[in-house]
Every structure is written in structure tokens, then in C-alpha cells.
């Protein structure tokens, strides 16, 4: 049984708001004003500047949820304090943005349906933190980390906007879309029979209910991926699927739009390769029993990086996709060491 963390964080935990209507305007009706949590450890001294690390939450999560009490576990600030007390982690400033959406989560890409979250991260969030906190203001002092959708978002930034970052850690991030998403479409269509194959009807029905079941959350997650990777500006909530709703036959054009966001595909771009080479560090890991089959994409991505002579750290561990926050014990010291 894990040991419960009873001690409260010893540093400063503060909050501020950003509002970037032009970037985060969306088809979901979600607010463009967002709350950002910031943790400044007690060891940070006045007059000095420290690495900036941004925590991108996984699907169904928010940076704010990483600050909340957890039974038989640690909040991320508690984890930071413990690692620092053990001498494993140097001081840095940590940022926890609320990027949750009405479709259940965020892939942190630019989408007319969900909002331009990729740009928001480096055009709005970073300057907002730099104006308020003692962080290194050069790209080489900034890092991103996340798990699952958050890991995907961190890697997406590295591939497409690497000039803004010094190091990135991706825990069990979405990649090889055929393996991790392809199997979901038949199940989604079965679920849609409850609403006469109406995507908007299904979403509206969920919004009227008091709770969402696990299977329904997976359907909503597929809708969120569709709104992220191939949004339809004329559809309710911006959602269209890359399959025929009657036969589940794949629409090659629509699926190609999805695949253009796959890190396996994105890595073939020369600009993406140069972005990764420009980083101080790239950390990837995945569980050997990941139930979403993300291990195979991670292995492919790492192997391709090796073939392209792109330096990176790739690790596997004996676990699933779930309950793996302990992997931050490995990635956070690694990131801060690269950025300091």
C-alpha cells in the first residue's frame, strides 16, 4: 500500500487568470478565461531565477486536479517537496493550467472547435508566468511534462513549436493513432445508436445527465479527438468522425487529417526533427502493459529517433496506463537537471 502524504506543501501555491478570447474562442461554448496554479518551492530564493516547468494534465484532468488532496498518494507539490527533501530535485517553478474542455479533456493542439491551445501555451501562458514569477525567460529554461493526453501535448509542442522549449517529458503519450484510436470507432457507433446516430444528440444527452459512465467517457474522448484533429466548423461541437456512421468504413481523407497529428507521422517532417535536435532533453516512457497499446507507438517513435540521430531518453516499466504518477519521480529531476 502506498504511504499517504500528510504534510502540506511548504512552498507558495498561488493562482492567476488569463483570458485569451482570440485564441481560445471555440465551438463548445467553453470559457476563454482560465485559472493557472503556480507552485514556488520554499527553496526558491528572492532575486534568483529558476527553470519553468508546465504540467499538462491527461484526459478528464486539469492542472488544478494535480493540486488536490489524494488518499494514499501525493499532490504534485507534495511530490516536489519530497524529492527536494531527498536531494533528488533542484528548485524550479511549476505551473498547473486548467485546460479542461466540455468534451472531457484536451490534446493541446490548435483547433477551431476546441480552441488554439498549442499557441496559447507559448503565446499566453508562458508570458503570463514570466511576468509574475522568478523564472528563466529564455526557451532553454522552460520545460513541459505530462501523461497520456498531457504527454501527447508536450510532445506536440516539441515537434511543432520546439523553439519555445528546452526539455520535454512525455509519459505514455498518444502515438501510432491506428493502434490507439482505430479500435474505438465500432464501439462509438454502437453507442451512437442510442441517439439515432446523432453525435450532437449523444453529447447533449450526456450534458443533461447527472453522471457519465466509463464507456460513455470513452465515446466522449473519441469525439474530443475528432474535434481536435479534424474539426468540422459547421457541425455541432465541431465533431465529425473519420468513418461512415452506417458501415464504419474509414474515410481516407478524414483519417489522413487525424494522422497528420500523429507523432509517428509528424516526426518525418524535417522541421520537427530539427526542433527535437534543438532541445536540451527529450524523455519518453510507457508501461509494458499499457491497455491503450501506446507502448508500440512509443517504441516506434524511439527507434525512429535513433535512426535519425535524435538524442532522447526512452524507458519502459512494468505497469499499465493507469496510476503511474510515480513516474514523475524519474522525469522531474531529469527535466530540471537539463534546464538548470
Indicate residue ranges for each PLM-predicted region.
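Non-catalytic cap/lid and distal C-terminal segments of serine-dependent acyl enzymes
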Residues: 1-340
